[in-house]
Amino acid sequence: MIKEFCAENLTLLPTLDAGQVSRVELCDNLAVGGTTPSYGVIKEACQLLHDKKISVATMIRPRGGDFVYNDLELKAMEEDILKAVEAGSDALVLGLLTTENQLDTDAIEQLLPATQGLPLVFHMAFDHIPTDHQHQALDQLIDYGFVRVLTHGSPEATPITDNVEQLKSLVTYANKRIEIMIGGGVTAENCQNLSQLTGTAIVHGTKII
């Protein structure tokens, strides 16, 4: 099982070891679902965690709220991506939608050059895409080179156990072309069971250890 620990800045990072987690998603402001951490935080986190053989996926999100970004915000995201790459990030986590809750392909294409080939993860903005469009969205993300999607299986704050069928559907459709990582209510106590129920061995959360 691959466990990704969702961390707010540096506070808990010294307590982690590679026996507990494979990867850290590094954020600021978890109270709003996570935003881009500072350059200094990213750099120090990467140095600390790389010594522990733990990889770092850095959140690129300029604010809380929706996932529809204007030109100014996209330029800020572009700069943040460049700095996150420079600071040593192993992957970048982002999510961009249109006002109709479809993938914002124009915005993705605008940001891609700045990522410099780093692995890309689409975060839980994915859950806001209508269910009947999610398979198409997976295909598009694969075409853009995304390696992983983080999903709760629903945009609602429902128990993740209520979303098992939708998560299974995504895992089956993805068929190992892109990783499906489950989150939002995954804990150290239930991760093994959820992995078996959904068919993915990749789990994410603040309480997975």
From Swiss-Prot:
Disulfide bonds: none annotated. The keyword Chloroplast does not apply. The keyword Cytoplasm applies. Keywords: Cytoplasm. Belongs to the CutC family. Its main location: cytoplasm. It is found in: Cytoplasm. This is PF03932 family protein CutC. GO terms for molecular function: copper ion binding. It comes from Streptococcus pyogenes serotype M6 (strain ATCC BAA-946 / MGAS10394). It holds the Pfam family CutC. PANTHER family: COPPER HOMEOSTASIS PROTEIN CUTC, COPPER HOMEOSTASIS PROTEIN CUTC HOMOLOG. InterPro entries: CutC-like, CutC-like_dom_sf. GO terms for cellular component: cytoplasm.
